[in-house]
Amino acid sequence: EHLVEYCKDNGIQVVAYSSFGPQSYIELNHPLAKNTPNLFHHDTIKQIANNHNVATSQVLLRWATQRGIAIIPKSSKKERLQDNLMIDEKLTLTHKELEAISKLNKNLRLNDPWDWLDGKFPIFA
């Protein structure tokens, strides 16, 4: 959260990578990913999705965009791509919902090269 605020204060656009959590890293046998709960099945995310009659993925994407964070979700399904493009028009989360999702923060960083290259290539941002 501190990095996001710093970037906003300094006119730097933050781009979310792996908006849905560890899914992409599980197949790579990343130990942190294996032990990280799937956000699609988290009770808080499911409840908010049910309240708005949307998919859990849409809740996660909107949480980012509503906070001014750019997203780059991928999908092989045309319908999902269309849903992702329309998320800002389709869903607005309440302040309480934004806070509830933000409280799920575990300060994980799955895409840190430091973890993959035995400390030879640190990333500082």
Give the predicted meaning of each segment.
Residues 1-125:
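Beta/alpha (TIM)-barrel catalytic core signal, keyed to glycine-rich beta->alpha loops juxtaposed to Asp/Glu
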